[in-house]
Amino acid sequence: MTQWAMTESLEDRRRLVRVARGLEEGDLLVRGARVAQPVTREILEADVLIADGRVAVLGGTGDGLQAARVVEARGAFLAPGFIDGHVHIESSLLTPAGFARAVLLRGTTGVVAEPHEVVNVLGPQGLEWMLEAGRRSGLRVWASAPSCAPASGFEAGGARVGTAEVRQMLGQPGVLGLAEMMNYPGVLGGDEEVWAVIQAGRATGRRLDGHAAGVRGRDLQAYAAAGLHSDHEATTPEEARERLRAGLWLMVREGSAARNLQALLPVLRERPRRAMLVSDDVSVDELLELGHLDRLLRACVAGGLDPLDALALVTCNPAEYWGLHDVGLIAPGHLADFVLLRDLQSFEVLETFVGGAEAQPGELTPPLSGGGVHLGQGWDAATFEVPPGWPVLGIHAEQITTSREPEGSGDARLIVADRYGRGEWSACWTAGSGLTGGTLGISVLHDAHHAAFLGGSDTDVRMAGRALEALGGGLVVVSDGEVRASLPLPFAGLMTGEAPQEAAAGLARVTAATRALGCTLPYPVTTLSFLGLTVIPSLKLTPRGLLDVEAWQLVPSR
C-alpha cells in the first residue's frame, strides 16, 4: 500500500537516474497523454515513464521509452494529483480509510489534515491515530499540529493542548507545521500561552496556519505581523485582497458548512500568486454526490478561470505552501501521483495513481479508545431554561457565522451539554432553523465536541442525550419520546468505520427525520455542528453560557 512517506534509498535514486538515461526500463509507462502543467501553463503531448513510484522521464511521444507495463492514455489529460491543503477529515464523519475511499476516485491523492476535532476529544493521541490511520488509507495524509484545543478559554473539551503538547505533536513524522491559530484575540492581545504556542511553531521553521474570521484593517496587519502565513476565513473579495496584500496565502474555502468560492471567484480570476482551494469541512453525502476538489475545479472553470490556473490551486500551490517538494508537479524525481482526466471542463476522473500505481483505498482502521458521551447523573432530571435577557442566536444556512437577533424572536431552543462528565449545560433561543418539534442531537460540535441539541421538549432532549450515550457518540433525532433516526459515531464520537455509502445513507435518514420536524436547513447536522465554535462570530453557545464573540465575553443574564 502506498504511504504518504515513501522510504527511499540512495540506490532507488540511482536507479531512477539510470531509467531516465535509458539504461534500464521503467516500471510503468503512461503513453499518449496530454500532460497539464499548471506551473508553466501549458499542455504537452507526452509519455510519462515511472520507476520506483517516481517520475523518471517526461518525454515526447515516440521517444522509445521502455517499461515493464504500459497504460495507454489515448489522449486523456494527465494532471498532478489533487491536494487539499486544509481539511478536517472528521467532519466527513468518516475515518481516513473511509475518506480515502470517497476522494481517491475523485482525483485527490493527498490532504493536509487538521485533526483538531479528534485532538479536542483525545489530545495528542488523536493526532497520532490520524497519521497512522492515514498511512493505512491509501491516501497521502499529512497533518498540521492543532494549536487551539479547545478553541478558546470559554470552554473545556476532552483534552487540553498546551505548549508542551504542541511541541510533542510538531515532532511527529508527517506533521508539516502549526495548525490554524484560531484564538486571534489572544494573538492580538499578547496572551502568553498563545504566544508560546506560536513560538513553538516558529522554532520548527515550518508553516504557521492562520484563522482570522472577520479580522480587518490594522488588526489583520497585526495578525500577519505575528508570523501567521495563511487564512481561509475570507468571505468577500475585499477581505481576500486584504489578506493577499498582508502577505497571507489565501485559502479559498468551499465546504458543506461555509461556501466562499463563488464570492471569491473575482479575486481568483486576477490570478493571485499565493492562493489555493480547500474544503475545510465537507460532509460524506456531499463528497459522494458532488465530489471533492474536482467539484471546485468545475466551478472555477465555469466561473471564468483558465483550467490550468484552476489546477494550480489544487496542485503546485498547496504543495509549495506546505513545503511538499515531491508532489504537485509532473516532473522527473517527483512522486508519481497523478490523475487521468477526460477533459479540463468536467474534470471527470478516469483513473487515479498514487506512487505510480492505481489508487487502492485501504481497508484497515486502527482502533481508537475513549471519546464517548458522558452527560452525568443529573441529566435525567435536567431542565433547560433560557436565562432572561439573552439575545436570540440567528442561524444562517450554509454559513458558520451567526447573528444576534432580538429577545423574543426565537423559534427553537439550542442546548449544549458537556459530554465529558462535568455535568454542565446551558440553553438559548435560536431563529432560522424552521424546526417546529422534536430534537436533533449530535456529539459533533466544533471544536470541543460537546453534545448539542436543537429544538424539542425537555423530555425529548433528555432522551436524545441518553441515546447519544448509548451510541458512544453520534447523531440522533427524537420526537414524542421516540428515536426516529440515528447514526453511531464510535470513533471519538466523531467518525464511523462504515463505508462512505453506508455513512451517507445513515446521515440521509437523520436529515430526513429532521426535515420531517420542520427544519429548513439544507445541511442541518453540519450547521448545528458549528453553533458552538467560539472563535467564529457572532454568538456561540457553550456548556458555560452564551458567548458574544466580538465582545469576547459571556453574555450576562438580566
Swiss-Prot record:
SUPFAM superfamilies registered for this protein in UniProt: Composite domain of metallo-dependent hydrolases (SSF51338), Metallo-dependent hydrolases (SSF51556)
Source species of the chain: Deinococcus deserti (strain DSM 17065 / CIP 109153 / LMG 22923 / VCD115)
Family: Belongs to the metallo-dependent hydrolases superfamily. Adenine deaminase family.
GO biological process: adenine catabolic process
UniProt superkingdom: Bacteria
Keywords attached to this entry: Hydrolase, Manganese
InterPro entries reported for this sequence: Adenine_deam, Adenine_deam_C, Amidohydro-rel, Metal-dep_hydrolase_composite, Metal_Hydrolase
Cofactor: Mn(2+)
Gene: ade
Stated name of the protein: Adenine deaminase
Listed Pfam families: Adenine_deam_C, Amidohydro_1
Reactions it catalyzes: adenine + H2O + H(+) = hypoxanthine + NH4(+)
One of the record's GO molecular function terms: adenine deaminase activity
EC number per UniProt: 3.5.4.2
Main EC class the enzyme belongs to: hydrolase
